[in-house]
Amino acid sequence: MVKELAVVDSQSNRVSSYVFKRPYSWEEVPALSARINQAIDHWCNWNDGDVLYSELETVLHREASYAVAIYCFGPQKTRFISGLIDRTVIDITQLGCPPFADISLHGISCTFVCHNFRHICALRTAYSLAQWLIFHIRYLQYATCPT
């Protein structure tokens, strides 16, 4: 399930952030899933959100309409997004991307004030990953320059 989605267009340096409404009530979540979700919720409240969850695919298609490739962090997110959109989806960890804590740009402001104290934010993470990817691509270009 996607609660927060951030998109960075590296060509235009445009960022977008979406917080999705809950797809169903908390009471409908099985007990085990509820405990797991509470442990990894990144401090997003289940009731937060302004975009209908049913709009997730529409948002992805709109945001990726001009993209050649989409980069996700980790195999689980990569598989999930691959199942929703007909684009090349690349797991950025396969390119050697380090953990978030090693690349986080702390100057980026987040939508939720509580995130600013916890350094967990989809927007900050996406922007940090995009900056790492740009650096990585440039490094590869210069590493292969003829001498």
Regions found by a protein language model. Name each.
Residues 1-4, 126:
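A broad structural signal for short, well-ordered beta-strand segments within beta-sheet-rich domains
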Residues 3-75:
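Conserved non-catalytic scaffold segment of RNase H-like nuclease domains
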Residues 12-16, 22-28, 62-147:
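Metal-dependent phosphoesterase core characteristic of DEDDh/y 3'-5' exonuclease domains
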